[in-house]
């Protein structure tokens, strides 16, 4: 998880809801796409930055296999606790989980074939510094794969949450939900990677659907996995009730055949050290 939201993800209820609702329906499909983009191969060494509950790391460990190596870092200990509690997937490499920031990375130089960061870089206070650290720890011609969401308006589940929040709670709290979408420019992301020294950089923009099969109530439960949820829990009960009533109204707009269906769109860059 990203540095700027560490304190929210250190509230245990948030990582638990994140892992239950968001990981399987959102982050695992995107992790598969990211691993495809970097063409991860058997036997390679991988660094996963802002691993959260280990989503990318676990799938990467299967791809590199027992002869590969995976180091996964995060700054939120409750997220790492969830990741460490999971059994390895069949045929995977061991995963070394470490509590660490992205600047500096806990690795010697030229140690990895691939560095990955799924939906973390936009939160880091020193984005260029984090990119330079990724390049430092990569072997010559090593590969980087980074995914960053586009505008919140093109990610309608969180747009629905934001609309409900803006209508019912203080603006400062409401706008925390926009943090994952704070670096929507693909060209800016690509330029930052070039400034950090990466080359042969390719930019992809992809969309994938997220389906909450149990509908609106499940989508409301999913909100508990966002870093805004602890702040909402501190509001007066009547304010919370008003918020969730408005949230149900907004989420109803996304219902198809009883399910909440929302596309998510992200920029992805792949480059070489």
Label each region the model flagged:
Residues 103-114:
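A short acidic, Gly/Pro-enriched loop at the edge of an enzyme's catalytic core
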Residues 3-8, 15, 27, 53-55, ...:
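Conserved Class I S-adenosyl-L-methionine
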Residues 128-129, 135-213:
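Conserved catalytic/acceptor-binding region of the Class I
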Residues 45-105, 129:
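Class I SAM-dependent methyltransferase SAM/SAH-binding core
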Residues 1-44, 55-59, 79-82, 86-90, ...:
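Conserved class I S-adenosyl-L-methionine
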Residues 64, 87, 165, 193, ...:
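Conserved hydrophobic residues forming the short capping helix/wall of the S-adenosyl-L-methionine
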Residues 113-127, 150:
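A short SAM/SAH-binding and catalytic strip from SAM-dependent methyltransferases
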